[in-house]
Design a protein with these regions (language model features):
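Flexible, compositionally biased loop and terminal segments
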Residues: 1-194
Length: 194
């Protein structure tokens, strides 16, 4: 009887062939959701184990993207809504993010592939130690440009829209445009650049 590992690899190859038959995106986004539920469904005693297993898949995801020649990925890790989780759960989750970001900064695969890491979101909402770990990963990979790994932490849909609109209006103001003219340029396409 074939082991699950062999079956999984066969299934993965089949999916890869099917995906390659279509148009490839240049940028994909992954929302990391359901890790707690996954851990509970597996009967794991610690829900954080689901988050750990998800974080450990990062290298495999990067391998897939390299195979598919997709150069940009944004991973949505921690929304502003997640920041209102119970303190103990949040502390453990933030600790996991910090540990993962520190390992990304020194990961030989990340450096070997030339992956540039960049964090987006309201980083000021995070503990200083997590911010420092994120900065370390960004600084360690700043010179790379083969692949781009955006880590969204402290993000929220409404906040992102507000930030993008503010950035657009500020840029138009610097160009000498008045408020009515700048407002006229607020379109989904224009704010999508921010």
């Amino acid at each position: 009887m074939l082991g699950l590992g062999v079956l999984y690899r066969l299934y993965e190859r089949r999916l890869l062939r099917e995906v390659r038959g279509g148009t490839m995106p240049r940028h994909i986004g992954l929302i990391l959701d359901g890790n707690r539920r996954y851990a509970l469904e597996l009967g794991l005693s610690d829900p954080l184990e689901g988050h750990r297993r998800g974080a450990d898949r990062l290298e495999q995801v990067l391998d897939w993207l390299e195979e598919l020649e997709i150069r940009i990925i944004t991973i949505y890790v921690l929304s502003t809504e997640n920041l209102s989780r119970p303190p103990e759960e949040l502390h453990r989750l933030l600790s996991l993010i910090e540990t993962k970001m520190r390992s990304v900064a020194t990961d030989t695969k990340i450096h070997g592939k030339g992956v540039r890491v960049r964090a987006v979101g309201q980083l000021g909402l995070l503990p200083v130690s997590v911010q420092e770990a994120i900065r370390a990963a960004e600084e360690a990979t700043a010179g790379y440009g083969n692949f781009f790994l955006n880590i969204a932490v402290g993000y929220g849909g409404r906040q992102e829209i507000a930030d993008a609109v503010q950035a657009l209006l500020l840029e138009r103001s610097r160009e000498g445009k008045g408020l009515p003219e700048a407002i006229a340029e607020v379109t989904p396409e224009a704010i999508g650049k921010y």
